[in-house]
């Protein structure tokens, strides 16, 4: 096969790819839409009259968290507090405090190993 024949084949293959490019159905795979969406990611932008276009492929990040206020429809209907025995005990007695001075030698494996004794 000569170079000329190879070039003809490669150009004809690229032409046929552009002419007969099948349209992929959007989001046909079940599962996470971020990983199963068949649309071109460059076209996946959303915008409203009050906002600039945003990429919808990666919808949430830490800066968007809490952007919208909670809607009353999703509030719990009733509040049932749980027992707070542990919190009440800590509130009454305080956290444990160890105010003693540690004078015991540290006997970890690193310090007991002869090769590491003088590396600190």
Swiss-Prot record:
Residues 1-25 are annotated as: Disordered. The keyword Cytoplasm applies. One of its GO terms (cellular component) is sperm flagellum. Coiled coil: none annotated. The keyword Transit peptide does not apply. Keywords: Cell projection, Cilium, Cytoplasm, Cytoskeleton, Flagellum. It is found in: Cytoplasm, Cytoskeleton, Cilium axoneme; Cytoplasm, Cytoskeleton, Flagellum axoneme. Pfam families: PIRC1_2 (PF14892). Its main location: cytoplasm. Residues 1-10 have a biased composition (Basic and acidic residues). Expressed in trachea multiciliated cells. GO terms for biological process: axoneme assembly; cilium movement; determination of left/right symmetry; flagellated sperm motility. Microtubule inner protein involved in the attachment of outer dynein arms (ODAs) to dynein-decorated doublet microtubules (DMTs) in cilia axoneme, which is required for motile cilia beating. Belongs to the PIERCE2 family. Microtubule inner protein component of sperm flagellar doublet microtubules. Interacts with CFAP53, ODAD1 and ODAD3; the interactions link the outer dynein arms docking complex (ODA-DC) to the internal microtubule inner proteins (MIP) in cilium axoneme. This is Piercer of microtubule wall 2 protein. It comes from Bos taurus.
């Amino acid at each position: 096969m000569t170079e000329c024949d190879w070039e003809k084949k490669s150009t004809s293959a690229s032409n046929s790819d552009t002419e007969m490019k099948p349209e992929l159905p959007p989001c046909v795979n079940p599962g996470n839409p971020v990983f199963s969406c068949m649309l071109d990611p460059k076209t996946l932008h959303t915008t409203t009259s009050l906002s600039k276009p945003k990429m919808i492929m990666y919808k949430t990040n830490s800066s968007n968290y809490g952007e919208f206020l909670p809607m009353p429809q999703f509030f719990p209907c009733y509040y049932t507090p749980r027992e707070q025995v542990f919190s009440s005990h800590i509130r009454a007695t305080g956290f444990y405090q160890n105010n003693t001075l540690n004078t015991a030698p540290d006997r970890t494996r690193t310090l007991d190993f002869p090769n590491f004794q003088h590396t600190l």
